[in-house]
């Protein structure tokens, strides 16, 4: 069977003696078993393609292998490698560097990312920082121009003279 991705095609061979697992559970998330490991792991919030490839190589699993055909031992290796991701990569690759509360470098996964992000924005609002005020008012935060773009609401048309 041929799976086409925008940048690459993968041939997934049908194995007669083995049945594919269509859902594989890793880190309390159901991942699609028909995809290669490097793409299936991106279903976890906090893991992109680059980190997925590093996790697969760190676990000793082929990144292009189909996730649904992997034995349970290799899936467990992937699970352990995701939990130990901070030990595999340098600190500049982690998504939470110098945490405000602890000062440690972490890699957040799953709902922890959303909760931490929301908490950071609320802290900015609480201390009345410039970025927090922009978030409160619903304006652009990162220095973009706002004269003509970023407008919301219905447009006001121009009436023509008769």
UniProtKB/Swiss-Prot annotation:
Disulfide bonds: none annotated. Residues 140-150 have a biased composition (Basic residues). PANTHER family: 30S RIBOSOMAL PROTEIN S13/40S RIBOSOMAL PROTEIN S18, SMALL RIBOSOMAL SUBUNIT PROTEIN US13. It comes from Methanosarcina barkeri (strain Fusaro / DSM 804). Belongs to the universal ribosomal protein uS13 family. Residues 151-162 have a biased composition (Low complexity). GO terms for molecular function: rRNA binding; structural constituent of ribosome. Residues 140-162 are annotated as: Disordered. One of its GO terms (cellular component) is small ribosomal subunit. PROSITE patterns: RIBOSOMAL_S13_1 (PS00646), RIBOSOMAL_S13_2 (PS50159). Keywords: Ribonucleoprotein, Ribosomal protein, RNA-binding, rRNA-binding. Located at the top of the head of the 30S subunit, it contacts several helices of the 16S rRNA. In the 70S ribosome it contacts the 23S rRNA (bridge B1a) and protein L5 of the 50S subunit (bridge B1b), connecting the 2 subunits; these bridges are implicated in subunit movement. Part of the 30S ribosomal subunit. Forms a loose heterodimer with protein S19. Forms two bridges to the 50S subunit in the 70S ribosome. This is Small ribosomal subunit protein uS13.
């Amino acid at each position: 069977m041929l799976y086409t991705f925008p940048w690459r095609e993968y041939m997934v061979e049908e194995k007669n003696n083995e049945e594919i697992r269509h859902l594989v559970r890793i880190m309390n998330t159901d991942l699609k078993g028909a995809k290669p490991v490097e793409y299936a792991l991106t279903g976890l919030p906090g893991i992109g393609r680059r980190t997925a490839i590093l996790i697969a190589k760190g676990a000793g699993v082929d990144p292009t292998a189909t996730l649904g055909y992997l034995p349970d031992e290799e899936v467990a290796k992937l699970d352990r490698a995701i939990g130990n991701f901070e030990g595999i990569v340098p600190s500049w690759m982690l998504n939470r560097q110098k945490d405000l509360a602890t000062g440690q470098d972490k890699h957040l996964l799953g709902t922890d990312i959303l909760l931490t992000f929301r908490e950071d924005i609320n802290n900015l609002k609480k201390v009345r920082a410039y970025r927090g005020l922009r978030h409160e008012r619903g304006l652009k935060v990162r220095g973009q121009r706002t004269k003509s773009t970023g407008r919301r609401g219905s447009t006001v048309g121009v009436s023509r003279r008769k």
